[in-house]
């Protein structure tokens, strides 16, 4: 029988960075984090300040940007601290806290992608009824439901993880406290934890993904009924950004969790985890903004209005 012990901290050894390269990686990750933070913050601020962006699509986009901002902060701030201090560790309480917020904002972004897909479906397939269907009340209710579901989901998994017992091994082969890695260290029975992960995984990941696929299948079906260059261009212009983000989000998750290698959280696993915790949130503002005329015009309006309001 394994000897159980009280674990006060975990070592995060998912990114074995040589000491001579510590500062280089610190600068790289800091730039990536600041790009993520400022890019997503800009979208949130623009949607709040510009009345032209007070639409369902940009309401969901601003919430997605806020979610991405927080999602990246959950892992990156601790990673930067560990690289700078050269002590890659996290306390037991800090680990559970990180798991809670990681799940909360990760799955919140997942549901927001579903809402945005539904918004595009209604806009393209039912343009005359769009305002009535995508009412402010419906959007607010959806956001409230998303927050409640993801908070409950994150709290359930965190509480289940808190009841686990651990042996002497406190090494987590990742750069943050990942629930899957934590379960591998547990000495106590993890059947309930794994069962709930699979059950909730279907509800939180699989069902939303299916809903997104159905939404776009209906959009494509609607366009094919009246094929024209203008309608096809409209679909790509309104859905291209969203499809890119969906592909990034689900592509990395499928590659990491559904198609694992022999050692799921080896260096390869940590690199893939870096993709969806850091790279995807960093790219989202560029994907949604660079070719988005509304966002560019909003930035110009907000910037010009601030200049005009200055006393000099």
Curated annotation (Swiss-Prot):
PROSITE patterns: G_PROTEIN_RECEP_F1_1 (PS00237), G_PROTEIN_RECEP_F1_2 (PS50262). Residues 49-55, 119-137, 218-234, 291-312 are cytoplasmic. Keywords: Cell membrane, Disulfide bond, G-protein coupled receptor, Glycoprotein, Membrane, Olfaction, Receptor, Sensory transduction, Transducer, Transmembrane, Transmembrane helix. GO terms for biological process: signal transduction. Glycans are attached at residue 3. GO terms for molecular function: G protein-coupled receptor activity; olfactory receptor activity. Residues 1-23, 78-98, 157-194, 259-270 are extracellular. The chain crosses the membrane at residues 24-48, 56-77, 99-118, 138-156, 195-217, 235-258, 271-290. Signal peptide: none annotated. GO terms for cellular component: plasma membrane. Gene3D superfamilies: Rhodopsin 7-helix transmembrane proteins (1.20.1070.10). The keyword Transmembrane applies. It is a multi-pass membrane protein. Its main location: membrane. It holds the Pfam family 7tm_4. The keyword Glycoprotein applies. It is found in: Cell membrane. Olfactory epithelium. It comes from the Eukaryota. Disulfide bonds join 95-187. Belongs to the G-protein coupled receptor 1 family. Odorant receptor. This is Olfactory receptor 1493. The lineage of its organism: Eukaryota, Metazoa, Chordata, Craniata, Vertebrata.
